Amino acid sequence: MDYHDPYFFGYVLGFIHLLGTGAAIHALLTVRTSQGAIAWAMPLLFIPYFTLLPYLVFGRSSFDAYIKARRQANQEMRIAIGDLNWRPWMEEAVAARRSEAYAALRAMPKLGNMPALANNKVKLLINGEETFGAIFQAIREAKKTILVQFFIIHDDKLGRELQSLLLEKAAEGVAIFVLYDRIGSHALPGAYIDKLRDGGVQIKAFATRGGWLNRFQINFRNHRKIVVVDGLKGYIGGHNVGDEYMGLKPPLAPWRDTHVQVIGPVVACLQESFAEDWFWATRELPPLSLPDEFPEDGVLCQLLTSGPADAQETCSLFFVEAIHAAEERVWITSPYFIPDEAVTAALTLAVLRGVDVRLLLPSRPDHYVVYAASSLYAFDAVRAGVRVFRYEPGFLHQKVVLVDNEITAIGSANLDNRSFRLNFELMLLTVDSDFSSQVESMLTADFNLAREISVQESHETRRLHQLGMRVARLISPIL
């Protein structure tokens, strides 16, 4: 091949543009939203030299082959669970449907394919010390099984404390299963994993698919955080395993996050969620445990799982339904605010209904492009009448929804496109006035430490900053 041929580079450029055109067509056919399709297709058509590789890494969001494989694995898992006659919540589900609180959930049980269950005990854990203090104490008391799932596990002080506890319990004969996300925990060294494995802990990485090409695919991250001990106690929320979640790493310290401890029949749903992801990673079921008895009364709870293999966009629909359900107030906290059109419309309509609509966002960025895009969406929300606050003391990472005086949701889902369509997420919904009152007190304290964004501020942003935010928003559908 003559690289000095004057036509050579023309052929190369033409070939790249041909590939870009093919990728643009693929984006138009497969990306779920029109905004995302356009955000990919235009650059692929006009500047494919810079966008083909990012599309290979970040794009292909529908990823049909993966979705089919995941759905098939989920079906196989349900068949395997059916063979175990695993139906632990029948009485609690009937009791839930008969309760007055059940009507507050409306579409949620069908949306999440998990039943609403009565008779649960829930405890709010409002920082890293409370969360990991409770989790580690439960692990120390474990007798039979421990299920652990996190998006991020670091080999630092907190990570090594978890490792030490798990090795100690494995030596006592407790069956331990650990699942981590391969992308979120990309910095986790092999020595950390090997030490757990050598000590008798079963540990696996959650990955999208096998194959050389899919090594470049970093979408479809498993963002869920689950700990279940002996089928008795479950933990769900926003914390990962790392010193930053304990507020030990400036400049984001102190870290603001929230977890929930739950005891009762909904813990069986947490185990099913873990089993679904574990089955995908191993094609085996972990042991599923039930207590001898459930609490006789307590809180109505529902676990809402969501992911890219769902038949509908479960996470986005959850936020839309929660906002539409609000009659007096809807307060939402999230580290990121990149809503789709449906969520934006729901927030606007809630304001027009006279609902007290508040958003609590961080004042410090952990991802600058996402923060810039979030800022522009926040300004739009303020101009629509939404009260938007920025948490001042440190980084806000909690994912909490409070609707009126009964409904709460706490878990892993952010108010952004990635949680809506790309990540595997998990939220715990509760219907209980006493627990909602606790969440209200927690959020009120957070709002008191926050600065409200004014309409004037949204108009006074410098032109250069506005340009940066608009560029960030342009690519926000693919973030």
Swiss-Prot record:
GO terms for molecular function: cardiolipin synthase activity. Pfam families: PLDc_2, PLDc_N. One of its GO terms (biological process) is cardiolipin biosynthetic process. GO terms for cellular component: plasma membrane. The chain crosses the membrane at residues 8-28, 38-58. Its EC number is 2.7.8.-. It is found in: Cell inner membrane. Keywords: Cell inner membrane, Cell membrane, Lipid biosynthesis, Lipid metabolism, Membrane, Phospholipid biosynthesis, Phospholipid metabolism, Repeat, Transferase, Transmembrane, Transmembrane helix. SUPFAM superfamilies: Phospholipase D/nuclease. CDD domains: PLDc_PaCLS_like_1 (cd09155). InterPro entries: Cardiolipin_synthase, CL_synthase_A, CLS_N, PLD-like_dom, PLipase_D/transphosphatidylase. It catalyses: 2 a 1,2-diacyl-sn-glycero-3-phospho-(1'-sn-glycerol) = a cardiolipin + glycerol. The keyword Membrane applies. The active site is at 223, 225, 230, 397, 399, 404. It is a multi-pass membrane protein. Residues 218-245, 392-419 form the PLD phosphodiesterase domain. Catalyzes the reversible phosphatidyl group transfer from one phosphatidylglycerol molecule to another to form cardiolipin (CL) (diphosphatidylglycerol) and glycerol. Belongs to the phospholipase D family. Cardiolipin synthase subfamily. ClsA sub-subfamily. NCBIfam families: bac_cardiolipin (TIGR04265). This is Cardiolipin synthase A. It comes from Pseudomonas syringae pv. syringae (strain B728a).
